[in-house]
């Protein structure tokens, strides 16, 4: 039997203010899946993503990534995850190539290898021609694709995105879906939260 890419069992999260965001969530996402958590604001989507990406501590339950327990072996599990947060959070005064190379370096990727990966990811995101421009000059859709390219620099087996198309027009949304489909087709399991498909 194939090991799930992500396995969540009886996951609960109650915040300190008493708000319960997750009530016994269980799900399996299989390798190669393109999985969307669809729901309105307040449904617990971002909390679930937060728990899986180790930004939020669960109250109870378990999470494993390709069979590695997130609580017992957090660093091993996190090596397999790439995260794209909802907000754009890179330095607008850096060039896309530098953003990617520096990110990879933070995770221990040697500079020569990081440069190779950066070229690959910028080409995959259709941003290679923008590699040496200031990132503040990129369009909104390009910035979103740069966020995906950055997350892919560690070659994750599982890519998690929180509302990747929030606040963007239909044309940018189409471009984002195309980029994510290409990432998924290349073998990365994709999980995202959204209000709409």
Model features per residue range: what roles?
Residues 101, 105, 112-130:
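Conserved ABC ATPase "signature" region
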Residues 53:
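Helix-to-loop junction immediately C-terminal to a conserved catalytic motif
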Residues 61-69, 76-77:
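Conserved ABC transporter NBD signature motif
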Residues 153-157:
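A short, proline-enriched helix->beta-strand linker immediately N-terminal to the Walker B motif
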Residues 159-162:
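Catalytic Walker B motif of ABC-type/P-loop ATPase nucleotide-binding domains
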Residues 134-138:
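Conserved ABC ATPase signature
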Residues 148:
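Hydrophobic anchor residue at the start of the ABC signature
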């Amino acid at each position: 039997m194939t090991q799930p890419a992500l396995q969540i069992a009886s996951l609960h999260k109650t915040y300190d203010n008493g708000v319960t965001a997750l009530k016994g969530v269980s799900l399996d996402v299989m390798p190669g899946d393109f999985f969307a958590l669809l729901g309105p604001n307040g449904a617990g989507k971002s909390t679930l993503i937060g728990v899986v990406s180790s930004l939020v501590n669960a109250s109870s339950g378990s999470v494993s990534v390709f069979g590695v327990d997130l609580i017992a072996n957090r660093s091993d599990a996190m090596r397999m995850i790439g995260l794209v947060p909802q907000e754009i959070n890179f330095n607008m005064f850096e060039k896309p190539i530098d953003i990617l190379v520096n990110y990879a370096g933070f995770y221990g990727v040697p500079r020569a290898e990081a440069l190779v990966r950066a070229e690959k990811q910028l080409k995959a995101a259709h941003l290679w021609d923008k590699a040496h421009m200031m990132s503040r000059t990129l369009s909104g859709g390009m910035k979103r694709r740069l966020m995906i390219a950055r997350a892919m620099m560690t070659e994750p087996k599982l890519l998690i995105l929180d509302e990747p198309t929030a606040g963007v027009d239909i044309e940018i949304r189409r471009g984002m879906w195309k980029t994510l489909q290409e990432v998924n087709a290349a073998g990365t399991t994709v999980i995202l939260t959204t209000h709409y498909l």
